[in-house]
Amino acid sequence: MSFLNVFSSRPTPKQVAKDRLKVILIHDRGELSDEVLDKIRLEILDVLSKYVEIENEDVDITVTKSNPIEGESPSLVANIPIKNIKGKAR
């Protein structure tokens, strides 16, 4: 059965928990408060809404650690699905 799991596209609960813990630790180390992250999220959505239609509920913005040559640094990662591009001729 474990052989078939190699081809599964769904992450295991263990992997999901591990990823969530990483995000929490990185968030803490990045020294960004929840208020700051919320402000960043709202400003990003405000700017993007001028150009594209998005579902606010589907937006995922997190702080992660990148791994550049000189060491790790926090990175802001945004997953924002676009429904439609405004002003696009149909």
Swiss-Prot record:
Record InterPro entries: MinE, MinE_sf
SUPFAM superfamilies: Cell division protein MinE topological specificity domain
Cell division is among the record's keywords: yes
Membrane-spanning parts: none
Pfam families: MinE
Coiled coil: none
BP GO terms, sorted: cell division; regulation of division septum assembly
Keyword Cell cycle tagged: yes
Keywords in alphabetical order: Cell cycle, Cell division
NCBIfam families registered for this protein in UniProt: minE (TIGR01215)
Stated family: Belongs to the MinE family.
Job of this protein: Prevents the cell division inhibition by proteins MinC and MinD at internal division sites while permitting inhibition at polar sites. This ensures cell division at the proper site by restricting the formation of a division septum at the midpoint of the long axis of the cell.
Stated name of the protein: Cell division topological specificity factor
Organism of derivation: Clostridium perfringens (strain 13 / Type A)
Gene name for this UniProt entry: minE
